[in-house]
From Swiss-Prot:
Function: Mitochondrial GTPase that catalyzes the GTP-dependent ribosomal translocation step during translation elongation. During this step, the ribosome changes from the pre-translocational (PRE) to the post-translocational (POST) state as the newly formed A-site-bound peptidyl-tRNA and P-site-bound deacylated tRNA move to the P and E sites, respectively. Catalyzes the coordinated movement of the two tRNA molecules, the mRNA and conformational changes in the ribosome.
Gene (name only): mef1
Protein name in the entry: Elongation factor G, mitochondrial
GO MF annotation, one: GTP binding
Example GO BP: mitochondrial translational elongation
Length: 801
């Protein structure tokens, strides 16, 4: 275990300063800390130690100045401050601590073996004493699936954090201990926010692929999320013991579908039920797992004869791929020189950290084979916290970008990336980017500048916790008693920094909900408030017209899980209405308007005139408001009210009451009254002009189109295609494998309700599908007509009441 006091040693000075040898540093440190042993030291030793102390104190002052200089450079000119300069100016003790840390996530398509793989990692690192399966017969379940729902359904719903220590045996026989903060993420698209917030704070990731299916739909989504946050990754091809396993097909798909250079760093010894182990292409040695749970690693110099030709070919392909992304290997390749083991490892690390390459490992987690070599790959090829560039925004300098420096002595900066309710209150997960977070310290929420005290700091192990007194830069922890929202930034008050927010997708499905019993209303409200705080993609709104509470989310499963959690955790049974699609409205043609709002009845009246036009925008996803007033016919404050009216009108369109997209409004003239004009008048006039012009423009209803991927056994291909055609799906591509096929299609969300039960019936329960929002497009004329009539009827019924 690391000594907390060592982490507080000052940083060394800018490169070039003379430093004490490590032995003398330790002596100095002990001399300072252990005053109680002073009587035991020789009197003659005092001057010598004093000399050392004087030199060390000088270094402390220089180091403090160096750290301050680095911080100033990070704020004033972040582009000029390289990550190498930050690393070079780390204190040796601090540099060693950070070099031994890996913050990683496990991400993949559904059922690729993420949680099973994580369970093996925890077992081999000694974090758990026994292996339990995701759908285990012992009613225990995998450690990282701590929710009852997760264990019942066999899926991961929430990302779960843990930590472990991996002892890696180096090539020279030395053993080095590394600290790994690990987050296991869900694979289902409905819980994509869990992957987003995990990748937002991690330094690296393990992307798991199925040896049979290769790159699947959610693999592509995960790849996109990793690119969004610049997360380096290694790849692990799992399920090598399955029938039809073809790891090199998966490697080819990483190259072709994900468009990232990839090459195998291992070759399997056997496949399917004859899978024995792997050949390491870097060291050219065979690796096997022995023991009841594969805990014993056996390394042999002999490479089996049956794979020698494949090993030679794949090593050549590895070197060629590296030559395309790394200059040093390129020079050796052109000179026809064979790179050494050290050169290959260094090149793979450089290219992986530089987001140019992903090394591919192979194994089978369920059969306990080749997981440990993948763990070695995490250490060898994924970055430590000091090697990753992290930026913040300086609120005091108009949100200019600043570079965060992972020094413990710097002012604290952290990000709350996940909230969870526990038996002890709200649990807030925090990534510390700079400085040190200490128990009892006061920190400031950058969003509202509210000061909060940190009463407890814990390290999480799924649903268990271990209390600590402080956490240094580059680490992940959880704190109790901090009232905040997901995505809030925290500082110690010295810096006005805030972190960039994570990407939060818009909900695509809604349904009405209410408690069956009125006596449950209080618990119902508590549950709604908690779920919204924890999950940014879960929205709760109240529709005044229908007098209904609506919940919105990423899919049917997403909302079903929250309804079930409400029943279990809050004992609230709910009634729900049919699913409602998040339709949108858009303008048709350019329409000019000249609208006058005039109400004068003796007292203060309303007067506002707005003139201009409305038209479609270039991009459907956005709305635009512009003013082109010449001569001051409308004052600035009234124009601000006009923009507010435009935004309010876009929130609820006049066609079917849904949000408006792709509409531009321009006001170029108007008129005011000396006494009767007000901000309210211009806001209302703009809304009225909007509604009138919108309805005259031949508007349309837009419906969400879902990128749908269906996989099923080959004998059901005709039935699946027929199912999709009945739903007016546009089939974009079809892939046929050895015993299964995959269909890629665009389907309207409205047409996909109930699809899962029909798919199960058509494929004898063997088919599966995923949906992800793709884009909005015009709904079919008949559907538009039905939606408009339904909306008008609801409006008429409401007015009758």
């Amino acid at each position: 275990m690391r000594c907390p006091s060592l982490a507080r040693l000052p940083h060394r000075a800018i490169s070039g300063l003379t430093r004490l040898p490590v032995r003398l540093q330790s002596q100095t440190f002990l001399y300072q800390r252990c005053a109680s042993t002073a009587a035991l030291r020789s009197p003659t030793a005092g001057p010598a130690y004093q000399s050392i102390l004087n030199r060390h104190n000088l270094q402390r002052r220089n180091a403090s100045a160096a750290a301050a200089a680095v911080l100033e450079a990070a704020a004033s000119n972040p582009d000029a401050l390289t990550q190498e300069a930050i690393i070079d100016n780390l204190d040796p003790v601090e540099a060693t601590r950070l070099s031994r840390i890996r913050n990683i996530g496990i991400a993949a398509h559904i059922d690729s073996g993420k949680t099973t793989c994580t369970e093996r990692i925890l077992f081999y690192t000694g974090r758990i004493k026994a292996i339990h399966e995701v759908r285990g017969r012992d009613n225990v379940g995998a450690k990282m699936d701590s929710m009852d729902l997760e264990r019942e359904k066999g899926i991961t719903i929430q990302s779960a954090a843990t930590f472990c220590d991996w002892v890696k045996k180096e090539d020279d026989g030395r053993e080095e201990k590394y600290h790994i903060n690990l987050i296991d993420t869900p694979g289902h698209i409905d819980f994509t926010i869990e992957v987003e917030r995990a990748l937002r704070v991690l330094d690296g990731a393990v992307m798991i692929l199925c040896a049979v299916s290769g790159v699947q739909s959610q693999t592509i989504t995960v790849d996109r999320q990793m690119r969004r946050y610049n997360v380096p990754r290694i790849s692990f091809i799992n399920k090598m013991d399955r029938m039809g396993a073809n790891p090199f097909k998966a490697v080819d798909q990483i190259n072709s579908k994900l468009k990232i250079p990839a090459a195998a760093v291992q070759v399997p010894i056997g496949a399917e039920d004859e899978f024995e182990g792997v050949v390491d292409l870097i060291r050219m040695k065979s690796i096997y797992n022995h023991g009841p749970s594969g805990e014993e690693i056996v390394i042999k110099d002999e490479i089996p004869e049956k794979v020698k030709s494949v090993v030679e070919e794949r090593r050549r392909m590895l070197i060629e791929t590296l030559a395309d992304v790394d200059d040093e290997i390129a020079e050796l390749f052109l000179d026809e020189k064979e790179p050494t083991q050290e050169q290959l490892k260094a090149a793979i690390r450089r290219a992986t950290v530089g987001l140019k390459f992903t090394p591919v490992f192979m194994g089978t987690a369920l059969s306990n084979k080749s997981v440990q070599p993948m763990l070695d790959g995490v250490i060898d090829y994924l970055p430590n916290p000091s090697e990753i560039e992290n930026l913040a925004l300086d609120q005091k300098r108009n949100e200019a970008s600043v570079k965060l420096v992972p020094y413990n002595s710097q002012p604290f900066v952290g990000l709350a990336f996940k909230l969870e309710e526990s038996n002890f209150g709200q649990l807030t997960y925090i990534r510390v980017y700079q400085g040190t977070l200490r128990k009892g310290a006061n920190v400031f929420n950058a969003r509202n500048n509210k000061k909060v005290k940190i009463p407890r700091i814990v390290r999480m192990h799924s649903n268990e916790m271990e209390e600590v007194s402080e956490i240094g830069a580059g680490e992940i922890c959880a704190v109790f008693g901090v009232d905040c929202a997901s995505g809030d930034s925290f500082t110690d008050g010295q810096l006005g920094y805030t972190m960039t927010s994570m990407f939060v997708p818009e909900p695509v499905i809604s349904l009405s909900i209410k408690p069956k019993n009125n006596k449950d209303s209080a618990n119902f409200s508590k549950a709604m408030a908690r779920f919204q705080r924890e999950d940014p993609t879960f929205r709760v709104t109240y529709d005044a017209e229908s007098e209904q509470t609506l919940i919105s989310g990423m899919g049917e499963l997403h909302l079903d899980i929250y309804i079930e959690r409400m029943r279990r955790e809050y004992r609230v049974d709910c009634e729900t209405g049919p699913p409602q699609v998040a339709y949108r409205e858009t303008i048709g043609n350019k329409v000019e308007f000249d609208h006058l709002l005039k109400k004068q009845s003796g007292g203060p009246g309303d007067y506002a005139r707005v003139v201009g036009w409305m038209e479609p925008t270039d991009k459907l996803e956005e709305n635009k408001f512009e003013e082109q007033i010449v001569g001051g016919s409308i004052s600035e404050k009234f124009l601000f009210a006009c923009e507010k009216g435009f935004n309010l009108a876009c929130e609820k369109g006049p066609l079917i009451g849904h949000k408006v997209l792709g509409t531009r409004m321009v006001i170029n003239d108007g008129a005011t009254h000396m006494t009767d004009s007000s901000e309210m008048s211009f806001k209302n006039a703009t809304q009225q002009a909007f509604r009138k012009a919108f309805m005259e423009s031949n508007p349309s209803v837009l419906e969400p189109m879902m990128k749908t991927v269906v996989t099923a056994p080959s004998e059901f291909q005709g039935d699946v295609i027929s199912l999709l055609n009945k739903r007016n799906a546009t089939i974009n591509d079809t892939e046929t494998g050895v015993d299964e096929f995959t269909v890629y299609a665009d389907c309207s969300l409205n047409g996909m309700f109930g699809f899962s039960s029909h798919l199960r019936a058509a494929t004898q329960g063997k088919g599966e599908y995923t949906m992800e929002f793709s884009h909005y497009e015009k709904a079919q004329p008949q559907l538009q007509k039905e939606l408009i009539q339904k909306y008008l009827k609801a409006q008429a019924d409401r007015h009758k009441k």
